[in-house]
């Protein structure tokens, strides 16, 4: 029987964990997206031309009560369609990471569900007690982006 937690099981196949670091309050999971190509969000053409890399820091759901961040080594791709307005774009992992987000989708979904059951300020207080860093105003913006009803 294994006595360690295998974090890879909690992440999509396209994401590979390269390193895990931690301190008393936070866990940092360094990951890389292992896709060979990416689809342009504007025209839908798949591209294999990697333009560059950059690091993103995204908040994920807490692990064992600690604030958890994904440090994503992401690729920027060049669109192969000459008639497309987009020259470069970043890779997404559908249903998990969005190019514009500072949180994983599951973290956003949890916060939205909590906000719809309580209130934005109340859910922000609950999130802070769980070591999820957010505010009532951020939750309102998140609900608007997801086009969920505000109560």
Predicted segments — roles?
Residues 58-151:
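Short, positively charged, Gly/Tyr-enriched micro-motifs
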Residues 1-92:
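Short, conserved DNA-binding cores of transcription-related domains
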